[in-house]
Design a protein with these regions (language model features):
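Glycine-rich phosphate-binding loops of nucleotide-dependent enzymes
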Residues: 2-250
Length: 250
């Protein structure tokens, strides 16, 4: 059974149709690469999946259940987290505030203190595992002191920290060095083996091919290709995307 399934998803902004009859599914422990030119509808579709936008029509299934209500709260309750290109961080706040944002500690004050200390330790370990911060983790460290790569690390850590079932990564390594990017993709491979699913939006087709198990290509809001990695080579994927881009301009 698919973890997430989209059936005939459409999204209009006024008279403009940004997503047109999209169908695909994401399986457990699968990385799906969502590819396409700028304006193809990738980010809009990601925001539909994460609950930021409601689809104009179509059906969303999670664990085989039809989601009759779909918003950010519904998506998060199902274990869907997102890392956007702009990171959506509160840069006036601390590292801890951003990683734990939107979550409440449970229990008494004494138990809360213990939980908070444990969360700091777990978040520290996660940041070190991803390898994106050069600073020792400190709950009070303000984001204003961090580099672009470190900020991206915080955004990624926040998504993975709460043991999400599906993480949407929208251009997750745009501001990172090659070394930092490699660490992120290695981490994605690790959590996939542990059962987590990912939707990866990126422009680097070779990196997408190395990381993903399945590829969905969008063109003007439509999914025009849906194929597993075992069924084509990286060069065949590139050639297919070139043909799609050429047909879009003829």
């Amino acid at each position: 059974m698919a973890l997430l399934e989209l059936k005939n998803i459409n999204k209009f902004f006024g008279k403009v149709q940004a997503v047109n009859g999209v169908n695909f599914e994401v399986k457990q422990s699968e990385v799906l690469a969502l590819l396409g030119d700028n304006g193809a509808g990738k980010s809009t579709l990601a925001k539909i999946i994460s609950g930021v936008y409601a689809p104009s029509s179509g059906e969303i299934y999670f664990d085989g259940e039809l989601m009759t209500k779909w918003d950010v709260q519904s998506a998060r309750s199902k274990g869907i987290e997102t890392v956007y290109q702009d990171r959506a961080l509160a840069e006036q706040q601390s590292i801890a505030s951003n990683i734990f944002i939107g979550r409440e500690l449970s229990g008494s004050m004494s138990m809360g203190f213990i939980n908070l200390k444990k969360q700091y330790e777990e978040a520290d370990n996660l940041m070190r595992e991803i390898g994106l911060t050069s600073q020792a983790f400190n709950a009070k460290t303000p984001l204003l002191t961090l580099s672009g790569g470190e900020l991206q690390g915080i955004a990624i850590a926040r998504a993975f920290y709460f043991k999400a079932r599906l993480v949407i990564l929208d251009e997750p390594v745009t501001s990172l060095s090659l070394n930092e990017s490699e660490k992120v993709y290695n981490f994605i491979d690790k959590v996939k083996r542990e059962g987590l699913s990912c939707i990866l939006i990126c422009h680097n087709i070779y990196q997408a091919y190395d990381t993903a198990d399945r590829f969905v290509v969008l063109d003007r809001g439509r999914n025009v290709l849906n194929v597993e990695k075992k069924d084509l080579s990286a060069q065949q994927l590139i050639d297919s995307m070139r043909e799609i881009a050429h047909s879009a301009h003829t």
